[in-house]
A protein has these predicted regions:
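Hydrophobic alpha-helical connector segments
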Residues: 73-105, 152-159
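Short helix-capping/turn signature of helix-turn-helix
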Residues: 50, 109-114
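An amphipathic alpha-helix adjacent to DNA-recognition modules
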Residues: 8-16, 28-29, 49-73, 87, ...
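Hydrophobic/aromatic-rich alpha-helical bundle segments in the mid-to-C-terminal region
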Residues: 104-109, 119-123, 141-172
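Short amphipathic alpha-helical elements of helix-turn-helix/winged-helix folds
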Residues: 17-21, 162
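Helix-turn-helix
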Residues: 2, 13, 21-55, 59
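Amphipathic alpha-helical packing segments from all-alpha helical-bundle domains
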Residues: 66-69, 73, 99, 116-142, ...
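N-terminal intrinsically disordered/low-complexity leader segments
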Residues: 1-9
């Protein structure tokens, strides 16, 4: 294995371990030592790759939200009806969550117990996800696929809540 591959695998191990630990215990409940132990790397590598626990946490949140933002890009590019896009996006979100159902806890914990990341995370990441769903509902109302007496934001929040509730209570 060359040094670049070794670096990438160590950073990835740290990121995966941190994601699991932050999802289970939130930012303040996780130590650098725990992350190092779970990832099987020296704790100094966390600072080397990520510049410390705060930057690592930021990267974990960004990576999780990137999963959803990438789905938005994929679904947006399809030439299908708005309601079909909405269904496809919801199905894709559910598939991602099925692979890692505990990771929704990461976002949920950030919303319930905000850290230094909360404001920028919500404004820059979560809002884009909500806005996309609201826009699809608006388009589906416009083309007659959804009743016109529905509020797009309310429909989007309802759908988001159903998905989140399912995965928060799944395996409980």
């Amino acid at each position: 294995m060359n040094p670049v591959e070794a670096s990438a695998s160590s950073a990835e191990k740290i990121l995966l371990a941190a994601t699991d630990l932050f999802a289970a215990n939130h930012f303040n409940g996780v130590s650098i030592k725990e992350i190092a132990k779970k990832s099987g790397v020296n704790s100094a590598l966390i600072s080397y790759y990520f510049g410390g626990k705060k930057n690592l946490y930021q990267e974990v949140l960004n990576e999780q939200s990137n999963l959803f933002l990438n789905l938005i890009a994929r679904v947006s590019s399809k030439d299908i009806a708005p309601l079909a896009k909405l269904r496809e996006y919801i199905t894709a979100i559910s598939e991602v969550q099925k692979l890692h159902p505990h990771r929704i806890h990461l976002i949920y914990r950030e919303l319930l117990t905000p850290t230094f990341m909360c404001d920028s995370f919500i404004k820059n990441r979560l809002y884009k996800i909500h806005k996309f769903m609201s826009e699809l509902v608006t388009e589906a109302i416009a083309d007659g696929s959804i009743r016109n007496n529905m509020q797009p934001t309310h429909v989007a929040f309802t759908l988001e809540s159903i998905i989140v509730f399912f995965f928060l209570t799944h395996d409980q």
